[in-house]
Amino acid sequence: MTAEFAYLNLTELRPEGWLLDQLRAQADGITGRLEELWPDVGPSSGWLGGPGECWERGPYYVAGLLPLAELLDDDALRAKTAPWIEWTLASQRDDGFFGPAHNRDWWPRMV
């Protein structure tokens, strides 16, 4: 049986035209500036090691920001994702658990 669809890496696709315009507007708008506008995804986020919100807001923010950065090949947006990813990877403990220590729920880690 042949596959109906082929798997592609995100970077194998490049937006053009209307879609590129929409993604650029997103990057230049709220998504690209959300940490300036919403404290829950700012420097005090629990997902950056701070005392703030540690549920799903940070992970969802990064889950949208990283693909946007890759689709636009935008180093400034990539730089915004780096602290989130680096902190999350560095937060892994001896038992394998990762993320904010004061929230042991798995849900925000599955984003």
Q: Which stretches of residues belong to each language-model region?
A:
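Low-complexity, Ser/Thr/Pro/Gly-enriched N-terminal "stalk/linker" regions
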Residues: 1-57, 79-99
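Aromatic-lined, polymer-binding surfaces characteristic
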Residues: 65, 90-98, 105-111
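Well-ordered alpha-helical segments within folded domains of soluble proteins
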Residues: 52-70, 108-111
